[in-house]
């Protein structure tokens, strides 16, 4: 027992427990986020006697007489300052880390009211952010310090909400102050908790499951096994190959497979009951790698399949082999890139509520409410009216929240028990369960003429897609179609294979396969420049695709093509670095916006004038931290002339908001932005006729947009693979004395920057994320197909480790005739970073590396 104060109130805690559990579960102080409960991520900082402390570490019995402050306990003035400063700086994206950042900032500013940039970065060194790259959070802390010193709030730099305005994100306040709801922040009277009993072996036949002892444990509400599933057993994003539960007689695919589900009155009882479920296995040989999967006579991950090949792609145009043979310079190299964990700050969580009609409503944190509805309704065997989905705030995704993780399990337990159920993954479960970035092995050959003009590229790639298909096929396809790079040449051939293994599944990850193959193409191009005797910048400028040119996939690019402009944007900094003798590396990239390759790609939006006389925006598109809600409000303001205060953005749901597809593929700004613009045209016509919003109450204005493209391999001279591409050039400059990165420059063609503040934040965040991919991040898997990393050992960059400068250059190239010319930027920001960094280190050391993460750098673990 201990007595202490929390936000000025004296409390006595009888039961010894972690402080975070008391603050969240008893006091419901939701600014204290539970990101890992391992003392690693830093989302749970509170002030204890003025010192920022992770609340997941101290036990309440050790806090006698202490003074604890959370964001809820800040003064009104402090809340105003941090909300304004973080909004003005663009510091907020998914928001899950932000209240803890505020606490760390307060801990600094209370003792140092005028910190340097380095001191601010050091103060948040124990707070991980996966979205922003820290630059704008540090900006926000320094701005807050300035406001506190001066004693008054300045006016915002922009408030007109037109497209192109640097307005504060619409969700800044609820994220800064911690009252915005993520699923784990929801507490319902009588709510139960769920958990999964997972396989002890990556590949084994389940011989029996005995749940009797677990069912008899006091506090257990129900235990579910496969026989309790009323509908279809399998779920899956594209291919339904992922069992909701493994049944008796079936073979497990990886250690994350579930064999039973527990529903109980509290999490402690769930954990106790899981240990009482008895499962008997026949252990079988596991497949650890694509090489093992491809070996003659290899066991099949899926019984009944002809082989372990999950996907095969072949992309060809012209005569690559002939062109390479006739080239003056030819380079061939083998490359490999590793598994990568998304490491979003918010672990997967879903709250399932029983509906009066016998169905369920799911409060989720995923990348498509409608996809969740489709999969869970089929599993429950109910129609869509009996399986409703509402998105809460989403604490980061990056592709890792496209698949089922907890939603179907929460839905099943709620459906069976008729009780509200919260189902949340522990951080270790999250690291095991959700799909990762594919590990790739790649062989590339490039031929150039004496002037450095690419003549042909031939390649083969192999990916480990793990236990399930997830999005392995589309990732492989995108890796292959983009492997040619953003250059104007004709002869290209690539063959790709994705193999099932018993490793954790791999699926969507920021860059969607292009990150891996771009590393190869750009590294060879840098090496080729040295052979030809020209600069890496010059070889790209000579080969760069220009408006009206033809990409290696045959698509004729339009006037919005801005690769040359990105190269020109970084040229002064590149020349200055070369002149000063600093080691500098460069790389380019392109990335599609939208699904493309002939797959129907719909954006949909509904504008409803509600009883409050305001226009409410409804779209099934998930806002996962990229700022989609702000974008759509800016689109409505621009295209209707309405004031910002007349517009309300509603989070996606499945019973009002029309399906607008997944938040994936850098697509939502373009496809849902255009759908919203079309809905605005209809509303604007009514307003122009003299009607007021009051007169339009109850009316709906619907817009949809279909991004039409041609299938891969379409028999047309110049297929349209994608409706739009973004282009980028990034540059890495090293400190030649220390060998550390002193500056990253990233120039990105975005068409129209709807909110330049958000665009810059996306660029900075993508750069830092792929600095980790290039230099430090690792996801080791042992001989039992078990990932061995914890959150704190993944190699994520921290605020005091980023370069002194990350320069984001926003290039706006007109020409795209949809969505006001805006092209999504979520993925491309992370694509060219690794090859640019690798080339910079070659310029420093004289040694090229063809595998990631790089080993010959100051960032590599000491051997």
Regions found by a protein language model. Give the residues of each.
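Thiamine diphosphate
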Residues: 397-418, 422-423, 628, 634-635
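Phosphate/diphosphate-binding loops
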Residues: 258-259, 264-266, 418-466, 673-695
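Glycine-rich loop/linker segments at domain edges
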Residues: 90, 165, 171-177, 307-350, ...
């Amino acid at each position: 027992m201990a007595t202490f104060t929390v936000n000025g109130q004296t409390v006595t805690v009888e039961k010894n427990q972690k402080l975070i559990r008391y603050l969240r579960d008893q006091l419901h102080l939701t600014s204290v986020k539970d990101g890992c409960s391992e003392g690693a991520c830093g989302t749970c900082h509170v002030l204890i006697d003025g010192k920022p402390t992770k609340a997941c570490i101290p036990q309440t019995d050790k806090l006698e007489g202490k003074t604890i402050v959370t964001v809820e306990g800040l003064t009104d003035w402090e809340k105003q300052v941090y909300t304004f400063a973080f909004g003005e700086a663009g510091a907020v994206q998914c928001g899950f880390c932000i209240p803890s950042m505020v606490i760390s900032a307060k801990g600094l500013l209370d003792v140092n009211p005028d910190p340097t940039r380095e001191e601010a970065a050091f103060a948040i060194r124990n707070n991980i952010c996966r979205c922003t790259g820290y630059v704008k959070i540090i900006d926000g802390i320094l701005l807050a310090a300035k406001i506190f010193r001066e004693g008054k709030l300045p006016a915002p730099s922009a408030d007109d909400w037109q497209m192109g305005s640097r307005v504060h994100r619409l969700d800044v306040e609820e994220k800064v102050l911690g009252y915005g709801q993520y699923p784990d922040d929801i507490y319902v009277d009588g709510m139960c908790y769920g958990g999964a009993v997972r396989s002890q072996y990556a590949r084994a036949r389940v011989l029996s499951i005995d749940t009797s002892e677990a069912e008899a444990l006091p506090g257990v509400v129900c235990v579910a096994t496969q026989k309790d599933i009323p509908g279809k057993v399998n779920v899956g994003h594209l291919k339904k190959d992922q069992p909701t539960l493994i049944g008796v007689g079936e073979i497990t695919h990886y250690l994350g497979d579930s064999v039973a589900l527990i529903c109980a009155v509290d999490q402690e009882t769930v954990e106790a009951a899981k240990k009482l479920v008895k499962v008997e296995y026949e252990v079988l040989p596991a497949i650890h790698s694509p090489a093992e999967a491809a070996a003659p006579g290899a066991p099949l991950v899926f019984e009944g399949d002809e082989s372990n090949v999950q996907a095969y792609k072949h992309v060809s145009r012209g005569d690559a082999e002939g062109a390479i043979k006739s080239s003056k310079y030819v380079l061939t190299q083998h490359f490999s890139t590793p598994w990568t964990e998304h490491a979003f700050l918010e672990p997967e969580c879903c709250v399932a509520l029983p509906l009066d009609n016998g169905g369920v409503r799911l409060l989720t944190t995923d990348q498509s409410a409608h996809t969740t509805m489709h999969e869970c309704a089929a599993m429950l065997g109910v129609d869509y009216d009996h399986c409703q989905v509402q998105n809460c705030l989403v604490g980061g995704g990056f592709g890792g929240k496209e698949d089922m993780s907890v939603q179907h399990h929460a839905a099943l337990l709620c459906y069976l028990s008729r009780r509200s159920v919260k189902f949340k993954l522990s951080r270790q479960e999250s690291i095991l369960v959700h799909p990762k970035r594919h590990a790739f092995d790649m062989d590339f050959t490039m031929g150039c003429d004496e002037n450095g003009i690419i003549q042909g590229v031939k390649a083969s790639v192999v990916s480990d897609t793990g236990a399930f298909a997830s999005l392995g096929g589309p990732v492989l396809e995108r890796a292959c179609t983009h492997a040619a790079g953003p250059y104007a040449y004709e002869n290209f051939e690539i063959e790709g294979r994705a193999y099932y293994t018993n490793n954790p599944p791999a699926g969507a990850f920021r860059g969607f396969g292009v990150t891996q193959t771009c590393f190869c193409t750009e590294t060879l191009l840098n090496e080729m420049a040295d052979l030809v005797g020209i600069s890496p910048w010059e070889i790209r400028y000579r080969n760069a695709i220009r408006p009206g040119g033809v990409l290696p996939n045959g698509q004729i690019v339009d006037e919005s093509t801005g690769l040359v402009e990105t190269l020109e944007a970084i040229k002064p900094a590149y020349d200055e670095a070369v002149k000063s003798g600093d080691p500098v590396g460069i790389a380019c990239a392109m990335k599609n916006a939208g699904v493309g390759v002939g797959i129907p790609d719909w954006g949909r939006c509904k504008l409803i004038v509600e009883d409050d006389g305001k226009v409410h925006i409804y779209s099934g598109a998930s806002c996962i931290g990229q700022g989609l809600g702000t974008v759509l409000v800016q689109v409505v303001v621009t295209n209707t002339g309405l004031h910002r205060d007349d517009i309300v953005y509603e989070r996606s749901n499945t019973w009002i908001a029309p399906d607008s597809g997944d938040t994936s593929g850098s697509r939502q700004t373009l496809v849902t932005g255009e759908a919203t613009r079309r809905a605005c045209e209809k509303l604007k016509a009514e307003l122009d006729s003299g009607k007021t919003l009051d007169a339009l109450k109850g009316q709906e204005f619907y817009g949809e947009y279909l991004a039409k493209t041609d299938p891969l391999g379409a028999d047309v001279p110049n297929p349209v693979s994608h409706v739009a591409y973004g282009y980028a050039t990034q540059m890495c400059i090293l400190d030649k004395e220390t060998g550390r990165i002193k500056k990253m420059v990233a120039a990105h063609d975005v068409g129209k920057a709807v909110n330049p503040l958000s665009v810059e934040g996306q660029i900075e965040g993508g750069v830092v994320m792929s600095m980790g991919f290039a230099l430090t991040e690792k996801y080791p898997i042992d001989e039992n197909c078990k990932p061995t990393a914890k959150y704190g050992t993944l190699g994520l960059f921290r605020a005091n480790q980023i370069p002194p400068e990350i320069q984001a250059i926003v290039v706006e190239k007109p020409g795209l005739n949809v969505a006001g010319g805006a092209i999504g930027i979520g993925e491309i920001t992370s694509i060219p970073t690794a090859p640019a960094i690798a080339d910079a280190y070659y310029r420093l050391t004289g040694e090229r590396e063809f595998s990631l993460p790089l080993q010959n750098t100051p960032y590599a673990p000491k051997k």
